[in-house]
Amino acid sequence: MKIYEGKLISKNLKFGIVAGRFNEFIVSKLLSGAVDALKRHGCDEDSIELAWAPGAFEIPLISQKMAESGKYDAVICLGAVIRGATSHFDYVSSEVSKGIAQTSLKTGCPVIFGVLTTDNIEQAIERAGTKSGNKGFDAAVTAIEMANLIKTIGE
């Protein structure tokens, strides 16, 4: 039986990152974690490109443009949607997650979901580098593994 696995080596890979500017205090921590993970696994800073989207809702379109360009081995999507008093949270989080998944399937490029969807600011802070780790770091590690897995399967 042949088994395919993606290695956690980012040398010679190129990554696009789409970050939503809304809740930038949280997203900037996710971004730092993602860049840290890429660099720790061998990626040069010149092989990372960042696009700032106005908010989480706009992330799928920008990630699609990046994925379709063919310039990237993977695209990492980072954002923070925090529940408020209205149903807006439900609509935004649902559409962002669907859009990111559809982009990955449509383009064949790994497009990684690193968008926090939390009930409150405390949960977002916990997931942006405190007691629950940094989900931006985790998303970047997933991007590295998926980029290598796609290359391995294609060989």
Curated annotation (Swiss-Prot):
Q: In which pathway does it act?
A: Cofactor biosynthesis; riboflavin biosynthesis; riboflavin from 2-hydroxy-3-oxobutyl phosphate and 5-amino-6-(D-ribitylamino)uracil: step 1/2
Please give the coiled-coil regions recorded for this protein. none
Q: Which residues bind (2S)-2-hydroxy-3-oxobutyl phosphate?
A: A85, T86, R127
According to its UniProt record, what is one Pfam family this protein matches?
Answer: DMRL_synthase
Q: Where is the active site?
A: H88 (proton donor)
Broad enzyme group: transferase
Annotated membrane-spanning segments are none
UniProt record, GO biological process: riboflavin biosynthetic process
Secretion signal, residue range per the UniProt entry:
none
Q: Tell whether Transferase is among the UniProt keywords.
A: yes
What are its E.C. numbers? 2.5.1.78
Q: Tell me which residues bind 5-amino-6-(D-ribitylamino)uracil.
A: F22, A56, F57, E58, A80, V81, I82, F113
Q: Name one GO cellular component term.
A: cytosol
Which InterPro entries did the record assign? LS, LS/RS, LS/RS_sf
Q: What does this protein do?
A: Catalyzes the formation of 6,7-dimethyl-8-ribityllumazine by condensation of 5-amino-6-(D-ribitylamino)uracil with 3,4-dihydroxy-2-butanone 4-phosphate. This is the penultimate step in the biosynthesis of riboflavin.
Q: What family is this protein classified in?
A: Belongs to the DMRL synthase family.
What is the protein's given name? 6,7-dimethyl-8-ribityllumazine synthase
According to its UniProt entry, this protein's organism is Clostridium acetobutylicum (strain ATCC 824 / DSM 792 / JCM 1419 / IAM 19013 / LMG 5710 / NBRC 13948 / NRRL B-527 / VKM B-1787 / 2291 / W)
